[in-house]
Amino acid sequence: MFDKKKLDRINELAKKNKEGILSADEIKEREILRKEYLENFRAHFRSRLDSVKVVSPEEYEQYMKNNKN
């Protein structure tokens, strides 16, 4: 999971960027944090997709019959 402090820092840098007051070091930091965030997001998203199972309507119907509560 991505660290909340890093996400807060990304948002802080984004706000400063909108105001047009980012230094060169802050631009580099922003890019590094963004890259790390996107890598984490993509990995998590891929793992979620890997756990998805596509079923036919018949399989779904059978599943629902077997799992009535």
Swiss-Prot record:
Question: InterPro entries per the record?
Answer: DUF896 (IPR009242)
Entry's localization field: Cytoplasm
Q: Is Acetylation set as a keyword in this record?
A: no
Cellular component GO terms, alphabetically?
cytoplasm
Q: Which UniProt keywords apply?
A: Cytoplasm
Domain of life according to the entry: Bacteria
Instruction: Please indicate if the UniProt record lists Plastid as a keyword.
Output: no
Predominant localisation class: cytoplasm
Give the protein family.
Belongs to the UPF0291 family.
Q: What name appears for this protein in its UniProt entry?
A: UPF0291 protein CD630_10710
Q: What is the organism of origin for this protein?
A: Clostridioides difficile (strain 630) (Peptoclostridium difficile)
